[in-house]
Amino acid sequence: MPQPLILASTSEIRAKMLSNAGVPHTTSGARIDEEMVKEALLAEQASPRDIADTLAEMKARKISDKTPGAIVLGCDQVLDHRGVLLSKPVDSHDALTQLQALRNDRHTLLSAAVICEDGKPVWRHVGVVRLRMHDVSDAYLQDYVARNWDSIRHAVGAYKLEEEGVRLFSRIDGDYFTVLGLPLLELLSYLALRGDLPR
C-alpha cells in the first residue's frame, strides 16, 4: 500500500502540480528561518545548488520528524544571478530593483526537492533552468510590478512564469516544472519506482 505523501510547504503552485499529476498528498508548512540559513551557508561559501538542497532537506526533515511512516517532500528554489542569490522581494521597490538587475541578462533557477522518511533523506534532486530576460523598459517593469505585486511578492526574482511574467523572457533552457519550483518529472519517476504511483 502506498505511503501518504506530505508536501512540507504551503506553496499553492507546488500543491497544484502534485494534484494535477494525480499524486495524493496533504500539505504541512515547515517553518524555518530561510534567510538565516542562507546567510550561514553563504558565509561557508556553499554553492547555490547546495543552498537549495539544504533548505529543501531542512523542510522535509522538520515535518518528517513529526510524522513517522510518512514520506515528506521538502522543496526550495534559489535564483543565481552572476553569483548573487536573489530572495523573495521585501517590497515593491525591491521587486523593481531585482527585475532591473535581471533584464537583458541570463540567470539560473535551481529547484531542489528532497524526500525524507522517518527523519532521514531517501531521495533528492536539484533541477536547473537557465533563463534570459528581454531588455524591457523601466516603465514596463514599473507597471508590471504595480499590476502583479500581490502575486509576485512571494516569488524569487519577482516574477511568475505561469502568469504575465512569461512576457519578460526571450529564452528558457530547462524544464517548465522546475521553473515553477518542483522538478516534477524526476519526482514522479521516483514515486513510481518505489511503487507509490502506478505506471
From Swiss-Prot:
Major localisation = cytoplasm
Q: What class of enzyme is it?
A: hydrolase
Per the record, GO CC terms?
cytoplasm
Keywords assigned by UniProt, alphabetized: Cytoplasm, Hydrolase, Nucleotide metabolism
UniProt cofactor(s)? a divalent metal cation
Q: What domain of life does the native source organism fall in?
A: Bacteria
What EC number(s) has UniProt assigned to this enzyme? Answer: 3.6.1.9
Q: Which residues form the active site?
A: 76 (proton acceptor)
Q: Name one GO molecular function term.
A: nucleoside triphosphate diphosphatase activity
Q: Name one GO biological process term.
A: nucleotide metabolic process
Catalytic activity entry:
a ribonucleoside 5'-triphosphate + H2O = a ribonucleoside 5'-phosphate + diphosphate + H(+); a 2'-deoxyribonucleoside 5'-triphosphate + H2O = a 2'-deoxyribonucleoside 5'-phosphate + diphosphate + H(+)
* Pfam families assigned to the protein according to its UniProt record, in alphabetical order: Maf
The entry's localization annotation reads: Cytoplasm
Q: Which InterPro entries match?
A: ITPase-like_fam, Maf-like
**According to its UniProt entry, what is the function of this protein?**
Nucleoside triphosphate pyrophosphatase. May have a dual role in cell division arrest and in preventing the incorporation of modified nucleotides into cellular nucleic acids.
Protein family according to the UniProt entry: Belongs to the Maf family.
HAMAP family referenced in this protein's UniProt entry, alphabetically: Maf
Which PANTHER family does this UniProt record tie to the protein? BIFUNCTIONAL DTTP/UTP PYROPHOSPHATASE/METHYLTRANSFERASE PROTEIN-RELATED, BIFUNCTIONAL DTTP_UTP PYROPHOSPHATASE_METHYLTRANSFERASE PROTEIN-RELATED
What is the official name of this protein in its record? Answer: Nucleoside triphosphate pyrophosphatase
